[in-house]
């Protein structure tokens, strides 16, 4: 949980940064690794060797992420929101209970919106065709909930919505 929250904090800051829509791999990787070191120093005063090793592994993953992110930006996708709150009081279909949540990231390209849920390697959930569906039914509800709750985000209408 700490690892995932730490990673999310770095990615949230990236999503709010000036380099979020850069197509330059080095700029993105530099931002992410610098931010990782900055937050690491703030959060862990006397980290164990295991924690330090996890941070270095995370930096390696950020370099890989930077390559994919730069390609995504070059393909026209722009990060428009990071850690976006879904307003309280949202109802799914005709349910009697309220749903709230946070969408990790929202990207836009022309009239398309992509709702993104970050997963860290320590997560039990991995979004693949096999993990998301069984007999054409969703097995993990987070992304489908994002999709339905995106109707409550007025600035996303009337865009085509995809999930990642």
Identify the residue ranges that each predicted region occupies:
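Residue-identity detector for threonine
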Residues: 7, 23, 33-34, 67, ...
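Non-catalytic protein-protein interaction segments used by genome-maintenance enzymes to assemble
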Residues: 81-153
